[in-house]
From Swiss-Prot:
It comes from the Bacteria. GO terms for biological process: translation. InterPro entries: Ribosomal_bL28/bL31-like_sf, Ribosomal_bL31, Ribosomal_bL31_A, Ribosomal_bL31_sf. Belongs to the bacterial ribosomal protein bL31 family. Type A subfamily. This is Large ribosomal subunit protein bL31. The lineage of its organism: Bacteria, Bacillati, Bacillota, Clostridia, Thermoanaerobacterales.
Length: 67
């Protein structure tokens, strides 16, 4: 590696809009994010599942298609 070519790698603080803060390594000192693992529905278990069977049946009825 060449000297003085690469940016300085330091500890960075990640701040989420929900208030959670994390420390990671980065070339920036601070970053702000809209969503993190503390507030994302997938990680919190509050996710919703979409019922696709009803949509498929509606499509088949609309266009007269059989299963």
């Amino acid at each position: 590696m060449k000297e003085k070519l690469h940016p300085a790698y330091q500890k960075a603080r990640i701040v989420c809009v929900c208030g959670a803060q994390f420390e990671v390594g980065s070339t920036k000192k601070e970053m702000r994010v809209d969503i993190c693992s503390k507030c994302h529905p997938f990680y919190t278990g509050m996710q919703r599942t979409v019922e696709t069977r009803g949509r498929a049946d509606k499509f088949r009825r609309k266009y007269g298609l059989g299963k």
